Amino acid sequence: MPVVFREGGYRFHFFSNEGDPREPVHIHVTKDGIDAKLWLHPEVTFAYNRGFDARTQRWIVSMVEARRAEIEDVWNGFFA
């Protein structure tokens, strides 16, 4: 499970087996047993959210938007 970055106790990562055919670029976020998955395109949106409150969801979206290029670089490098 490649970890792209950690911030404030949150782990931003993806899985090495992302389906066949592979799903589009996305990121998983976990903390304290709570998790979410976000699509990066066409805009950053939740695929699912399993427990993060609205304020935390807004923060997660802002983090992913700010680091979208980094996430894509790591994803593309891993799956190249």
What spans do the regions from the language model cover?
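A short, structured beta-strand/loop element
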Residues: 15-54
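A broad, low-specificity signal for short, low-complexity segments enriched in glycine/proline
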Residues: 1-2, 24, 33, 75-76
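Generic preference for hydrophobic/aromatic residues in regular secondary structure cores
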Residues: 4, 44-48, 67
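C-terminal structural segments of small proteins and small subunits
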Residues: 51-80
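Negatively charged, low-complexity tracts enriched in Asp/Glu with abundant Ser/Thr
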Residues: 1-12
